[in-house]
Amino acid sequence: MITIPYLTAVSTYFSYGLLFAFGQLRDYSRLIFDWWRTNNLQGYAPICLAHEDFYIRRLYHRIQDCFGRPISSAPDAWIDVVERVSDDNNKTLKRTTKTSRCLNLGSYNYLGFGSFDEYCTPRVIESLKKFSASTCSSRVDAGTTSVHAELEDCVAKYVGQPAAVIFGMGYATNSAIIPVLIGKGGLIISDSLNHTSIVNGARGSGATIRVFQHNTPGHLEKVLKEQIAEGQPRTHRPWKKIIVVVEGIYSMEGEICHLPEIVSICKKYKAYVYLDEAHSIGAIGKTGRGVCELLGVDTSDVDIMMGTFTKSFGSCGGYIAGSKDLIQYLKHQCPAHLYATSISTPSATQIISAIKVILGEDGSNRGAQKLARIRENSNFFRAELQKMGFEVLGDNDSPVMPIMLYNPAKIPAFSRECLRENLAVVVVGFPATPLLLARARICISASHSREDLIKALQVISKAGDLTGIKYFPAAPKKQEVEKNGIKLD
């Protein structure tokens, strides 16, 4: 729950209203004075919806230089950001040959495997020489190598499940798997802030979807009670299947799932638990095994475990882990396994090598050091931001920490000021977040040194002063929320 002070809420609404008014005025002026330049195809339906087209032209274009900044280096603690210029008021951006060396607080490179690694990289290169860059085939044709089989065994062992299946894309893991698991006559109960891949997968399943308040087990139980009592729409027959979908760490909030309570409720009402560990696997827990290890939840109590290899493991793709019967069923039914090209062998080798480093099977203790460092870095950075007076979302141990901006004018102001000081940050606004809840999302890595973090804090503090986003008094004992505020989920 985020509480916005009234003054901040009013100024944010006013800013959006001003942008909307000027956008409408410009459209009206163009209709009158530049009518011959319009390119309306008679008889064709518009490709873009009117409100989406307006948002892109009149709001997004003003600040699009703050998004999708290209880089020309590995996503390490420091990256080379390619400079871009525009000669048409930001409508189009042209890349230049100049780069800026920036401290990287935007990548999901939690354990630092995204750049050269003394153990992983040589094995990836050797795999590339032996297997090439692609299998050029799906898993059921000629796209399964010994490395793919080894990776599935490695993942199953690592996450504590009997079996696993891997996919070439993390997003597609959710969006393609959920429709295979459940369909018409089934019920999906989803956290209100679940990732888009989960939302799209649920919509594509044909199942009935109900949403519970973000990370609130009490409301989840209320929804379960109501839906079980009511049954299917119109017929009121019992649900064929109920799946509760949650995330380990919520990527836009940095909050850790209340998994023990959710698992207990699902057991009580005989609902399956689907856990998305995209941002938690490898990043939290004593040995990097995610939210189950951190919170002491037995992995046998989680029916479907999903995760990606793009964050902590420095590769690509995703996985589903569960019972042997479940995995065998998915291998025979899931389109992402049957028809999509399998994950490249070098990418699979990178994941296997990273897991071996994490578990100490490379003959060193670098994995344990990385896990200790990501936790120490995350908690240090979060505490320092809060002392400065920023409104920071999320929980301790989480490497994801959003800083609330709220006002749309502060999105480009904060982003550009940080870039000017050679700090690369990610800013997020509508429609990725609710209209009033724009934020900067900080991602901490084990590859960051203490000096890196101190420099980042100095830059963020300066940018926060200039943009007015320090919503709390400096160095508070505890972040207190204003009594009079507007509460938003």
Curated annotation (Swiss-Prot):
It is found in: Endoplasmic reticulum membrane. Its EC number is 2.3.1.50. One of its GO terms (cellular component) is endoplasmic reticulum membrane. It holds the Pfam family Aminotran_1_2. The chain crosses the membrane at residues 2-22. It is a single-pass membrane protein. GO terms for molecular function: pyridoxal phosphate binding; serine C-palmitoyltransferase activity. It catalyses: L-serine + hexadecanoyl-CoA + H(+) = 3-oxosphinganine + CO2 + CoA. It is an enzyme of class 2 (transferase). Serine palmitoyltransferase (SPT). The heterodimer formed with LCB1 constitutes the catalytic core. Plays an important role during male gametogenesis and embryogenesis. This is Long chain base biosynthesis protein 2b. It comes from Arabidopsis thaliana (Mouse-ear cress).
